[in-house]
């Protein structure tokens, strides 16, 4: 029996990267999964992977920054699977790499809409179902960029710092309810959102240096974040609440430096 057997879960940003890895991991451990993404094609691939492995999943194409869409996929989970036990608000965007003084208000609004308002809407619409049941796990993807300066672009970093505060506030709002709210703060993970970083390093012949600023001396992989998400989703994390967990190879544990050798 898997650690999520019988649970109903929603994973946003499930078309690739961390979201896909987490949706697959949840299904492997017995959850019925609603996979959400803006890309119908990518979602179809994720759901096919889950089905091929013997899991249960349905796809919902939706924009997490649209409240009606979020309400819709939460309702779809309840209708299809009979309830909601876990929601992983993972979908996010990086924005562009423009210098701070050249960034537009529109850029900030879009990054905040997806990265911060999206998790807020997931909490807003999922929590009432969990509160009525007296249990549930809400997980949000923040970032090491929300903990340490210079780990991400300005609007991205600000949005992820906001997610950490949102999680802490929500956990205390749902005091003594059985509903837990936590965040995962990934470091440099090899996903679509970091593809440009890896592509630039490859073009310069410095791909082997990626991740050298953390003590583990390498970048992370999506499944390593999915494993943390699985723990937080499971009953094994029953006493874990209101926390933001760096999964970054140790990057946030110290000041960056370039090791010798």
Language-model features: locations:
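Residue(s) in the substrate-gating loop at a strand-loop-helix junction
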Residues: 143
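Alpha-helical segment proximal to the catalytic Tyr-Lys
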Residues: 128, 172-176, 238
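Short C-terminal tail/terminal secondary-structure segment
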Residues: 97, 230, 241-261
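C-terminal helical subdomain
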Residues: 183, 204-236, 240, 247-249
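Active-site helix of classical SDR
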Residues: 123, 159, 167
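Substrate-binding pocket helix/loop in short-chain dehydrogenase/reductase
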Residues: 98-100, 107-109, 210
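Short, small/polar-rich loop/turn modules that mediate ligand/substrate recognition or access, typified
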Residues: 83, 175, 180, 185, ...
């Amino acid at each position: 029996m898997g650690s999520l057997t019988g649970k109903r879960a929603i994973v946003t940003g499930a078309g690739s990267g961390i979201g896909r890895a987490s949706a697959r991991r949840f299904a492997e451990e017995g959850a019925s999964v609603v996979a959400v993404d803006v890309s119908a094609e990518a979602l179809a691939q994720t759901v096919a992977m889950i089905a091929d492995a013997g899991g249960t999943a349905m796809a919902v194409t939706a924009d997490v920054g649209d409240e009606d869409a979020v309400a819709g996929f939460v309702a779809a989970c309840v209708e299809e699977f009979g309830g909601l036990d876990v929601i992983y608000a993972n979908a996010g965007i990086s924005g562009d790499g423009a210098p701070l003084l050249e960034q537009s208000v529109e850029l900030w609004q879009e990054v905040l809409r997806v990265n911060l308002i999206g998790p807020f809407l997931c909490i807003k619409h999922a929590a009432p179902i969990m509160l009525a049941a007296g249990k549930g796990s809400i997980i949000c993807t923040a970032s090491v960029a929300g903990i340490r300066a210079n780990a991400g672009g300005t609007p991205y970093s600000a949005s992820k710092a906001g997610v950490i505060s949102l999680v802490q506030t929500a956990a205390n709002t749902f005091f003594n309810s059985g509903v837990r709210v936590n965040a995962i703060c990934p470091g440099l993970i090899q996903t679509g959102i970091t593809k440009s970083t890896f592509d630039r390093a490859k073009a310069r012949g410095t791909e082997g240096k990626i991740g050298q600023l953390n003590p583990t001396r390498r970048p992370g992989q999506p499944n390593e974040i999915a494993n943390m998400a699985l723990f937080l989703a499971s009953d094994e994390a029953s006493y874990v609440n209101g926390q933001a967990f760096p999964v970054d190879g140790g990057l946030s544990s110290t000041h960056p430096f370039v090791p010798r050798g």
